[in-house]
């Protein structure tokens, strides 16, 4: 996938718990370990990782799907927002979380893919695994 990627991980929680945490300020901050401001409403802006990540929520399907216009402070000013789709699917030992992240600046996809692993998936496994 040019300027994007798809990645999945199983998190030890049900889809509703992950959905709620992703879309609430307290939950997002707790599951990542870094300050966030998030709303569970379409059209609302969000920030995460102390403002490094920011954007707007575009589509929501409760407990199943989140779509956001997404960027970081490292994006070139003239670059359009990327598109993040989060799919939540119940599996035997938790929820399969699949991220499809497209429209990233050229040559940045591998760095952002690793960032999702290090700064989201690892802390989410720890948080929900308690």
Q: Which residues are covered by each model-predicted region?
A:
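Hydrophobic ligand-binding cavity/cleft-lining segments
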Residues: 1-37
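A conserved amphipathic terminal alpha-helix motif
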Residues: 103-130
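Hydrophobic beta-strand positions in extracellular immunoglobulin-like domains
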Residues: 11, 101-103
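Hydrophobic-ligand binding "helix-grip"
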Residues: 29, 33-36, 47, 51-96, ...
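Alpha-helical scaffold segments that form or flank carboxylate-/histidine-based iron centers
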Residues: 6, 13, 44-49, 111
């Amino acid at each position: 996938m040019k300027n994007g990627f798809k990645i999945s991980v199983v998190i030890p929680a049900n889809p509703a718990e992950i959905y709620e945490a992703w879309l609430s300020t307290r939950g997002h901050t707790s599951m990542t370990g870094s300050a966030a401001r998030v709303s569970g409403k379409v059209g609302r802006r969000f920030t995460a990782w102390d403002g490094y990540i920011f954007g707007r929520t575009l589509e929501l399907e409760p407990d199943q799907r989140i779509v956001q216009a997404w960027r970081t402070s490292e994006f070139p000013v003239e670059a359009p927002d990327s598109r993040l789709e989060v799919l939540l699917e119940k599996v035997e030992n938790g929820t399969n979380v699949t991220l499809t992240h497209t429209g990233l600046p050229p040559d940045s996809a591998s760095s952002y893919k690793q960032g999702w692993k290090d700064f989201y998936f690892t802390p989410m496994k720890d948080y929900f695994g308690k």
